[in-house]
Each structure stands twice: as structure tokens, then as C-alpha cells.
Swiss-Prot record:
Organism: Clostridium perfringens (strain 13 / Type A)
Domain of life: Bacteria
Alphabetized InterPro entries for the sequence: Ribosomal_uL13, Ribosomal_uL13_bac-type, Ribosomal_uL13_CS, Ribosomal_uL13_sf
Protein name, entry field: Large ribosomal subunit protein uL13
Keywords per UniProt: Ribonucleoprotein, Ribosomal protein
Biological processes, Gene Ontology terms: negative regulation of translation; translation
One Pfam assignment: Ribosomal_L13
Keyword Transcription in record: no
Subunit structure: Part of the 50S ribosomal subunit.
Family classification: Belongs to the universal ribosomal protein uL13 family.
Known role: This protein is one of the early assembly proteins of the 50S ribosomal subunit, although it is not seen to bind rRNA by itself. It is important during the early stages of 50S assembly.
GO molecular function: mRNA binding; structural constituent of ribosome
Gene3D superfamilies found in the cross-reference section: Ribosomal protein L13
GO cellular-component term (any): cytosolic large ribosomal subunit
Length: 144
């Protein structure tokens, strides 16, 4: 019996809603990255984008454990000497919680064209409302 290899045209995609309120950022992000990649499906093929669409709500209520709010830094560099800018995650989560969540998921996905394609299926919202009711998303309960 031959192994099944998924083709891009045959992949059926579902829509899921994940509530991130009160849950650790890394744990939610790792499960969302797995769904975006399609690893929860028996037809997973590494070289095909076979993941589902994910809507994350309540991104502003996500939690960082321990002292990470003050000690973990978001780093960006201007490529000039001395151009490293560091921002504590406390400020990032106050100003742009959607960006913090998307960045955590992006770093868990493959780099390259396929990873960027997977990331486009992620929709993150600060509050509890989203505008994807027409897609009839299923509520997804996370494992932990």
C-alpha cells in the first residue's frame, strides 16, 4: 500500500475559533501553529499547505508566566551600529497584543514561502468579537 500524499487542490479547510483569555502565550501559540500547519490531520504532508484557518480572540488577555512580562524583550535592529531596540513584553502586550501573538506563532512555523502562506490563515483579534461569522467557525478547546 502506498503512502498518501496530499495535493493542494484536494485539501479541505475548516475554520476554528480559539479563546486565548487567561492562557499562557506559548502554549496557545504552539497549538495554533500546529493547526495552521495541518499536523492535526491524518493527511498531513510536510510540503503542502494543508492547515486550517484559525481565529484567535481575546489576545489582550493572554498571560505570560513568571517574570517574563518584564524580563522577556522584543528585539529589533535597524542594521546600523548600536541600532538594537529592545521593548519589554509588558509594553508590547499593552500596545499591540495581536502583534505579540502573531510573532509567537510566526516563529513556530517554517521559514520560507510555505510558512508565510500558513501565517496568512491566522486572524488575531484583541477583544471577543470577530467578523468571520459567515465562515461558521467551530470553537476549539485547547489541550492545556
Amino acid at each position: 500500500m502506498k503512502s498518501y500524499i496530499a495535493k493542494a487542490q484536494e485539501v479541505e479547510r475548516k475554520w476554528y475559533v480559539v479563546d486565548a483569555a487567561g492562557k499562557p502565550l506559548g502554549r496557545v501559540a504552539s497549538q495554533v501553529a500546529s493547526i495552521l500547519r495541518g499536523k492535526n490531520k491524518p493527511t498531513f504532508t510536510p510540503n503542502v499547505d494543508c492547515g486550517d484557518f484559525v481565529i484567535v480572540i481575546n489576545a489582550e488577555k493572554v498571560v505570560l508566566t513568571g517574570k517574563k512580562l518584564d524580563q522577556k524583550m522584543l528585539r529589533k535592529h535597524s542594521l546600523y551600529a548600536g541600532g538594537l531596540k529592545e521593548t519589554p513584553y509588558r509594553e508590547v502586550l499593552e500596545k499591540k497584543p495581536e502583534f505579540a501573538f502573531e510573532e509567537a506563532v510566526r516563529r513556530m512555523l517554517p521559514t520560507g514561502v510555505l510558512g508565510r502562506k500558513m501565517l496568512k490563515k491566522l486572524n488575531v483579534y484583541r477583544g471577543a468579537e470577530h467578523n468571520h461569522a459567515a465562515q461558521k467557525p467551530e470553537v476549539l478547546e485547547l489541550r492545556y
